[in-house]
């Protein structure tokens, strides 16, 4: 079979510079842009820049920027599978080998958007780096150099859409760039241009992208009729929340083709929704599920007792503590349940259980505390999950820092709950319920204790 390549030259206008050529952006942002081109005639090409010295640029260029994307999951309870060739990437640049080619993009007046996914550690400022030393600079440092080229060319700024999974990713990126501009003495006019001509948006991205399907790639290539070294796979669900001027949405109108891209004045409530409902549901349920002898998220969702405690935790205890419109919370919770039931993804509970103490502090404990604050009583299902956390850390399955594992294994519940450094505050006032649920689980077994808890709430 021949390698996947273009049959004819592309006539796309290069409008997007993308830092990151990995699975996530190709299965998320590039898929959206490809759909916008084909369904709305946006005609936008993506120039991909490789953030690290080693990467996929050569493979992308060998395939003329093309790759197959296979989406699969549940939609309204039905199994859905979709395959498409994504054609929006015009070329890929390895800036370590072609630095001039990278900086030449700054002089393209059609270029309007910068998308990035350089990992959570990518957006950082390190003092003492030298202007012009591309190879030894951070991503924000390189971007500062790129923006200076743009400024010197007398061109307008960009709409920046960072996808790194950190709070206020756009604000942090802008802050780093301004620090480099000041340290490198690039001038007040340039700093003013950064602030006035460029739009740094804060974003929240949500899609599970599972990447290259090693086990089934050969079989998939047979069905395609060509070889593809860059097959990407992802779930059906997608969400991109962008905090920025809603007028900018008209320049990249994903909403016109029904994509779940939301422009808002504040991304925080949506981030809280994701952390509390999606991540919180994982963390509140996987430890009890593991103690009950289950292995995967699919097993957990198929078990009525375990999935029941998660369902009641989400709908009766987490959602009432959140302030978005109820319809948006209920729809997201419904989507989460479908995502957890995805028959195409084998998600092991123990992989989710990694570092559960710190996860519980961020994902579940705030819901417990807010529930108590609003309703004057403890949320039973979330309290059971806290008891399950303590019991889980007494097993050999717990994976965390050696200090946390050793302490959690040997300490009493009272000692654990009083550790302010673990929880951000002393939560000893929760001890009564925790000890009650631990005693029930030790006497009856975790599964029966959960079943009894369900009966109490009927």
Annotate each predicted stretch with a short phrase:
Residues 1-458:
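Substrate/ligand-engaging "lid" and interaction regions
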């Amino acid at each position: 079979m021949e390698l996947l390549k273009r049959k004819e030259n592309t006539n796309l206008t290069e409008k997007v510079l993308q830092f990151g050529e990995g699975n996530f952006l190709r299965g998320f942002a590039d898929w959206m842009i490809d759909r916008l081109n084909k369904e709305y005639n946006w005609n936008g090409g993506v120039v991909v820049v490789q953030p690290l010295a080693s990467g996929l640029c050569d493979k992308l260029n060998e395939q003329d920027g093309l790759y197959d994307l296979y989406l699969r999951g549940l939609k309204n309870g039905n199994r859905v599978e979709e395959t498409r060739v994504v054609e929006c990437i015009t070329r890929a640049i390895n800036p370590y080998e072609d630095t001039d080619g990278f900086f030449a993009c700054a002089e393209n007046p059609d270029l309007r958007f910068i998308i990035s996914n350089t990992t959570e550690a990518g957006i950082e400022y390190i003092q003492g780096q030298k202007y012009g030393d591309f190879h030894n600079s951070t991503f924000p440092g390189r971007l500062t150099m790129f923006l200076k080229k743009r400024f010197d060319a007398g061109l307008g700024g960009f709409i920046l859409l960072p996808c790194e999974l950190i709070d206020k990713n756009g604000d942090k990126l802008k802050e780093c760039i301004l620090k480099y501009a000041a340290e490198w003495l690039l001038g007040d006019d340039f700093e003013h241009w950064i602030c006035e001509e460029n739009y740094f948006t804060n974003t929240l991205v949500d899609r599970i992208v599972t990447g290259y399907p090693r086990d089934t790639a050969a079989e998939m290539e047979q069905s395609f009729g060509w070889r593809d070294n860059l097959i990407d796979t992802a779930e059906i669900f997608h969400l991109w929340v962008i905090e920025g001027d809603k007028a900018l949405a008209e320049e990249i109108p994903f909403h016109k083709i029904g994509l779940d891209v939301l422009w808002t004045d504040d991304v925080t409530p949506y981030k809280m929704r994701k952390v509390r409902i999606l991540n919180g549901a994982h963390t509140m349920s996987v430890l009890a599920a593991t103690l009950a002898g289950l292995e995967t998220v699919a097993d957990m969702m198929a078990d009525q007792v375990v999935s029941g405690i998660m369902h009641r935790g989400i709908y009766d205890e987490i959602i009432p503590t959140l302030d978005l419109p109820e319809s948006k919370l209920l729809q997201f919770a419904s989507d989460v349940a479908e995502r957890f039931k995805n028959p195409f993804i084998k998600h092991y509970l123990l992989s989710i259980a990694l570092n559960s103490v710190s996860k519980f502090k961020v994902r579940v404990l705030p819901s417990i505390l807010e529930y108590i604050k609003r309703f004057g009583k403890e949320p039973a299902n979330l309290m059971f999950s806290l008891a399950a956390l303590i019991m889980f850390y007494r097993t050999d399955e717990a994976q965390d820092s050696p200090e946390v594992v050793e302490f959690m294994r040997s300490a009493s519940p009272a000692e654990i709950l009083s550790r302010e450094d673990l929880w951000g505050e002393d939560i000893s006032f929760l001890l009564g319920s925790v000890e009650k649920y631990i005693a029930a689980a030790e006497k009856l077994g975790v599964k029966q204790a959960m079943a009894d808890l369900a009966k109490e709430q009927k």
